[in-house]
């Protein structure tokens, strides 16, 4: 389950930010996760609760915001939102697409005290 290692990375970031900015508790942590990032949300939620024990984020509410998949179409030259990596271009129907977004994962923000 790679969600556990993702949460370990998040914990490291939270602990670093707590030291830098002097907060003791994270109330809410918001993640932006791309549609194609390959992250199982339920597994991430479980791993988050386990990995954050004993940290500033213990008991924090995890909010996941899904970012859309995006691709550049080589047929029409436009960038468009796609639901699946193998979808045709929604603008022209072309099949030559290069994904340009939707595989990212980042901490958007945290509510702290």
Curated annotation (Swiss-Prot):
Q: Which GO terms describe its molecular function?
A: nickel cation binding; zinc ion binding
* Ligand binding (Ni(2+)): 2
> Which PROSITE patterns does this UniProt record tie to the protein?
HYPA
* Sequence positions that bind Zn(2+): 73, 76, 89, 92
| Keywords (A to Z) from UniProt | Metal-binding, Nickel, Zinc
Q: Which GO terms describe its biological process?
A: protein maturation; protein modification process
Protein purpose: Involved in the maturation of [NiFe] hydrogenases. Required for nickel insertion into the metal center of the hydrogenase.
Which NCBIfam families does this one have? Answer: hypA
UniProt family annotation: Belongs to the HypA/HybF family.
Q: What is this protein called?
A: Hydrogenase maturation factor HypA
Q: Which organism is it from?
A: Cereibacter sphaeroides
Name the gene behind this protein.
hypA
């Amino acid at each position: 389950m790679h969600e556990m290692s993702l949460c370990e990375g998040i914990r490291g970031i939270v602990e670093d930010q707590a030291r830098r900015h002097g907060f003791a508790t994270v109330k809410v942590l918001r993640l932006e996760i791309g549609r194609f990032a390959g992250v199982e949300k339920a597994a991430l939620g479980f791993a988050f609760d386990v990995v954050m024990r004993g940290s500033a984020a213990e008991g924090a509410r995890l909010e996941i915001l899904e970012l859309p998949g995006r691709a550049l179409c080589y047929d029409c030259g436009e960038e468009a939102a796609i639901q699946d990596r193998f979808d045709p271009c929604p603008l022209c129907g072309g099949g030559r697409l290069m994904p340009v977004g939707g595989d990212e994962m980042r901490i958007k923000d945290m509510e702290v005290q």
